[in-house]
Amino acid sequence: MPNLDKLIIGFDHALRTLLTPAQTLRPVPGTQLPEAELNDLEKSESAALMRVNHVGEICAQALYQGQALTARNAEVQQTLAQAAREETEHLAWTERRINELSGRKSLLNPLWYGGSFAIGAFAGLLGDKWNLGFLAETERQVSAHLGGHLSRLPHADEKSRAIVTQMQIDEAGHATTAVAYGGAELPMPVKLVMRMASSVMTRTAYWV
């Protein structure tokens, strides 16, 4: 069971994720590219898609924190912590791009975080192989979702496309790492439920 220190650290992480700008150690992908001259419709579409991606990173932070809270193996905890650090960079990249596009973040971010944290904590309680399997499947689905966004983003919006492309590469790496550390293949019904939940989140975050 998680101790009080872990709970306090988790609460602090939640506040920082939701209330303070995320920081990145790596350069933001696409920084060197010129800003495209997008029309209002294209700009709105890019901002909405990047908002969805930002929500995805909010959820990823919460999932990893929940999983790490209940994970039983120190090595698994370290794997989750490393993935969370890279997701923090994704959070910073998407937030910066939303601001550049004069967009806004989702109004439901606290809800997304709370729900994802609970799911992650439950996954951790199932044992490390299922915990890592859940991580791997989550990253596979996120990678596929990012691929869909690459097909929807305006072709001229090279800055957003560069960010999403690098995020997709990172997510694939997280999935591979989780499997290498012993992640189990999830049953198909679980995968389908995850896809349905993801669909609700992405459709809602596009607008709200």
Swiss-Prot record:
Gene from which this protein is expressed: coq7
Catalyzed reactions: a 5-methoxy-2-methyl-3-(all-trans-polyprenyl)benzene-1,4-diol + AH2 + O2 = a 3-demethylubiquinol + A + H2O
GO molecular-function term, one example from the UniProt record: metal ion binding
Main location: membrane
InterPro entries assigned: COQ7_proteobact (IPR047809), Ferritin-like (IPR012347), Ferritin-like_SF (IPR009078), Ubq_synth_Coq7 (IPR011566)
Family: Belongs to the COQ7 family.
GO biological process: ubiquinone biosynthetic process
Protein name (database record): 3-demethoxyubiquinol 3-hydroxylase
Pathway(s): Cofactor biosynthesis; ubiquinone biosynthesis
Domain of life: Bacteria
Keyword Transport attached: no
Cofactor-binding details, from the entry: Binds 2 iron ions per subunit.
Cofactor needs: Fe cation
Location of this chain's protein in the cell: Cell membrane
Pfam family, one: COQ7
Source organism: Nitrosospira multiformis (strain ATCC 25196 / NCIMB 11849 / C 71)
Gene3D superfamilies according to UniProt: 1.20.1260.10
Binding site for Fe cation 2: 87, 139, 171, 174
Membrane topology: Peripheral membrane protein
Keywords: Cell membrane, Iron, Membrane, Metal-binding, Monooxygenase, Oxidoreductase, Ubiquinone biosynthesis
Entry EC no(s): 1.14.99.60
Residues noted as binding Fe cation 1 in the record, renumbered to the chain: 57, 87, 90, 171
UniProt GO cellular component terms: plasma membrane
Function: Catalyzes the hydroxylation of 2-nonaprenyl-3-methyl-6-methoxy-1,4-benzoquinol during ubiquinone biosynthesis.
